[in-house]
Each structure stands twice: as C-alpha cells, then as structure tokens.
Amino acid sequence: MKFGKEIAKKNQIIYRYIILKIQSFEWPANTRIFSERQLEIRFNSSRSQIRSVLATLLNKNIIRYTKNTPGYFVCKDVGFSFFHKTQDNLKVKYAKLSTLIKKLLSQDDASVFANIDSTVHLDKFKGIEAKFFDENKKHFLNVCFFAKDDILNILDENNLQQQFFREFAYNGIAIEKRHCVTSVDKESGCLVMYDMYYDDNDNFVVASKSNFLNPELKVINA
C-alpha cells in the first residue's frame, strides 16, 4: 500500500512539473516538451511511470503525440488563456489593478457563484478589481477577483494583460479546472462572466467576475 502511495505521489510531482511548465508559458502552445527519456532521467522514474503521466495529459488534451515528428507537443488550445474568446477579441494593452483588497462581492454575485459551486463560500473572501484597456486606451473590461488574501497578493498589474495563470505557475499553483457561467447585466445589457478556478487537486483557488463594457459583445467560444 505504501509503495502504491509513493508511486501516486511521484506521478503527481511529474504531472505538476509539466503543467506548470505549460501554464507559465515556458512551454507555449505547439512546443515539444521533454521526451520520455528526458523525463525518466530528470525524475529518476521508470518509463512506464512516465508514460502513465503522459497518458493522463493526452487524455485531457493538454498535450498531443505526433508520429510524423515523433514527440509530445503542447496542444494549441490547451485552455490556460485568461481571456474568453469574444466577437471583437480585443487585445489588452495595459491593466490597472486596485491596490486595496476589500469586500466587493454583492449578494447577487454570491448567489451566482453558489450555483456554480455551493461548497465554496465566497462571502468569506475579499476581492480586488482590475480594469483593462485596449491599444487605443479604451476601457473595455472590468474583472473582480475573489480569493484568500495570499492568492490576491499574487496578482501582478504588469502581467494581468497577458496571462494571470503565469503568476500562479511561478508560485507553484497549477490551475487545472474552470467552471463558467455567462449572463447579461440587466441595466447595461452587457456580457457578464462568472468563473471559478481549481488546482490539480480540485481545490478552489480563485473566482472572477468579468464585466464587458461593449453591449454588442457575445462569447463565441468560452
């Protein structure tokens, strides 16, 4: 039994190593990752153990295997993008992050998040707000993040316009799963998206509410 637990623990270490490499964009989409042999040497593991981990990643469509150019590659649509694909697909030029961590969660928002996952009580957490601007300096998106203070402190204004997952990867937090609900703001008619993110052990990490400021905007692939 102890031997089985040790194997499972080693598998998790190898799995997380690969996930964090991808999440931090050290291994971006279409990049060839380490070979079975390289991983075997790096982690002092058997070939069968390495293949077991790679099989899990293949089944989750995080990596792919090609025969023409033998090797494992990061999938093109691996799913670590911070932004949802929308009709206008605006590029973020810069972001402004609130310096204060405070209570931002409304009762209505709390109800939406509770419908996504009733086991996470976001009313216990504070929030921080980020404003996003396009290359023409037009303010087009507000995002509120809700989590424990130590998680919120990881967020970096200088990197928010790229991928906030990168900051979590640098801090050893592997984002594995996302649950999402979309709605429309009754007053503005604009798109609102509620997201909850979980690590590779299925533990809640952070939630976000994204308010898009263009009433014509629609999600085409979330």
From Swiss-Prot:
Gene Ontology molecular function: DNA binding; DNA-binding transcription factor activity
Write down the PROSITE patterns for this protein, in alphabetical order.
Answer: HTH_GNTR (PS50949)
Q: Which InterPro entries match?
A: Tscrpt_reg_HTH_GntR, WH-like_DNA-bd_sf, WH_DNA-bd_sf
Q: Which residues form the HTH gntR-type domain?
A: 8-77
Keywords, ordered alphabetically: DNA-binding, Transcription, Transcription regulation
Record keywords: Nucleotide-binding included? Answer: no
Question: Can you name this protein?
Answer: Uncharacterized HTH-type transcriptional regulator MG101
Origin organism of this chain?
Mycoplasma genitalium (strain ATCC 33530 / DSM 19775 / NCTC 10195 / G37)
